[in-house]
């Protein structure tokens, strides 16, 4: 499914929206679309175990547990304390909490989640996994986000990005659709690795959607 050049009308999807969404129990909008995708693509990137991996706007993503189990140092960034607590509770990990500059640091089981604003992050990482960050943002907010994410990668770093494509006339986000022209503009040099249809009923009921996997490497 490809539809280029779609602009998403302005909406307020700032921190207040996500705090409210998590409080209502609906934050994990990508839940259930995971499973084999990460296992099928991450090993091909040949990132050395022990490398620090950034997961922006992480929510309670089980991808963080998968990465930690495979020997990576995982750093998620998430605005909602509900999501941070839920991740560690669901994986039965006792987390330690401490202030860390502008963040509250949750840490345990090889996973660190920095509770706070992603734009306050100033560290760099060997790799990043974005499955729920870019697609959580409406069109007008994505350039700033992508620019900041690119700057968080070390020279020679790699980004694994997952976007979703669907007809925005059939449903509204989040997750928002991101089409190939925009993905390449936001992440220069990004290469499409795969696309596969999403088969859950909520997608088939609105005419279908594709999950698209991209890889970008920094110079």
Residue ranges: model-predicted function:
Residues 2-47, 60-63, 76-122, 146-148, ...:
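Class I (Rossmann-like) S-adenosyl-L-methionine-dependent methyltransferase catalytic domain
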Residues 28-32, 53, 138:
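Short, flexible loop segments at the rims of nucleotide/cofactor-binding pockets, characterized by
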Residues 48-59, 68, 73-75:
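Conserved class I S-adenosyl-L-methionine
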Residues 49-52, 136, 170-171:
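Short, contiguous strand/loop micro-motifs
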Residues 128-129:
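Hydrophobic beta-strand segment of the Class I
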Residues 133:
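Hydrophobic adenine-recognition pocket in adenosine-nucleotide-binding enzymes
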Residues 136-148:
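A short, conserved alpha-helix within the catalytic core of class I
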């Amino acid at each position: 499914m490809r539809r280029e050049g779609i602009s998403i009308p302005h909406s307020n999807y700032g921190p207040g929206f996500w705090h409210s969404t998590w409080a209502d129990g609906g934050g994990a909008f990508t839940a259930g679309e995971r499973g084999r995708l990460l296992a099928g693509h991450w090993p091909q990137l040949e990132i050395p175990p022990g490398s620090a991996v950034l997961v922006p706007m992480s929510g309670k993503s089980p991808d963080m547990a998968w990465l930690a189990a495979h020997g990576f140092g995982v750093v998620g960034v998430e605005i909602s304390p509900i999501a941070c607590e839920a991740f560690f509770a669901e994986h039965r990990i006792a987390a330690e909490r401490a202030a860390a500059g502008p963040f509250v640091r949750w840490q345990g089981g090889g996973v660190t989640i920095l509770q706070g604003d992603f734009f306050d992050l100033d560290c760099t990482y060997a790799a990043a996994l974005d499955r729920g960050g870019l697609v959580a943002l409406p069109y007008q907010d994505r350039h700033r986000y992508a620019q900041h994410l690119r700057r968080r990668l070390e020279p020679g770093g790699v980004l694994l990005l997952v976007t979703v494509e669907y007809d925005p006339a059939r449903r509204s986000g989040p997750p928002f659709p991101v089409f190939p022209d925009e993905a390449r503009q936001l992440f220069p040099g990004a290469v499409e690795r795969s696309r596969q249809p999403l088969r859950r009923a909520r997608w088939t009921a609105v005419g279908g959607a594709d999950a698209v996997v991209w890889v970008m490497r920094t110079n």
